Amino acid sequence: MKLMDSTLLGRSRFSFFAAMPDSVTQAVSALYDAYPFPPEPMQDGPPPGYNWRWHYPSAYAFCTGRAPQLGRPRILDAGCGTGVSTDYLAHLNPSAEITAIDISAGTLAVAQERCQRSGVADRIHFQQLSLYDVAQLPGEFDQINCVGVLHHLEDPDRGLAALASKLAPGGILHIFVYAEIGRAEIRQMQEAIALLQGERRGDYRDGVAIGREIFSQLPANNRLRRREEERWALENQRDECFADMYVHPQEIDYNTETLRRWIEGSGLTFLGFSDRDRWQPDRLFGSSDTLRDRFQSLSKWQRYRLIELLDPEITHFEFFLGRSPLPQYDWSDNDQLLHAKPVRNECLYGWPSRDIFDPDYRPRTLSEAEYAFLEQCDRPLDSALTVAELLQTSSLDLAAVRQLIDQQLILLVPAQT
């Protein structure tokens, strides 16, 4: 039985089924039938809060700098699991046409029940389908969400190509895959559990039991045990999470170099990591001008690689890809900014109030002038005012407006050209 294979473009692979793609699909489906994932509880009514990556206007603005023109986007949740993301996508995009697919019938049933209880199931088309087979779906999609799925495929290149083929011109694709450096201890434990399971590999309940027994018996100062207790134990109290992490039959982990090559092979454009604060050098280099200057001399992907090497807490990559043509606005042109119409980002927790959480749930206290400006932006687009009109009655200047844009508190609609 083949446990580890590092030959796939330098990516770290964990699989027992390297030569049997159908077996991989069946094994992954069986895991999620046994342990539907993610195991978040259901609720009657909308899910709490938001994830701006699942709010099409916010995601599109992150990728392009402007709010989208589409009033009824088509959204695909590719590998929807138990429907947590699907539920948010439906509530955050009430005018969207949404399709959700997954290979696991058991997991898909949970997703349907979740969305039924929250009141949005009638707006979602659910279908049991492999990512490899998305060509069976009609039409193209303006936004595709694929979180925690591609790294569990036998052939991620084929999976990404399949998704790319369904992305409409100007469409955006959000992806979440594992990072190899931050998951080194996880890979070691995966292989240890598999060795002890032997021929019982594929009995996921046995794998969970063996894994928990290992952790309970390892010395308290053992590195694998410490990592589990310090980083993962809280979420891994749930067997579904423990199974997904330690007894998954198929996993491929990336580093920034293999990620770059994978993206380049897709024919899509890299639009940035959605957790952009993690990729800022200041949090690692402090006040060192020497390190900052050397950092600035590197290429974009060399910078990413350096940050990855210096921060072993990076356990995943989340990022957007897009299909051209995609507009790009940086709002550096004053005239262009003055004629644009700002609208308040709907992903602001605590609004209306001066004390809010921004789209990334960071606390933010608005000044009186900022609050007044956002109040004026909190109106339908057909009655929205331009930045120039708003500044006539505001003490803010263009620099302050640009700060609101950078913090994703407002989204901008360019003037008609």
Swiss-Prot record:
Pfam families: Methyltransf_25 (PF13649). Disulfide bonds: none annotated. CDD domains: AdoMet_MTases. GO terms for molecular function: methyltransferase activity. To M.tuberculosis Rv2067c. PANTHER family: METHYLTRANSFERASE, SLL0487 PROTEIN. This is Uncharacterized protein syc1184_c. It comes from Synechococcus sp. (strain ATCC 27144 / PCC 6301 / SAUG 1402/1).
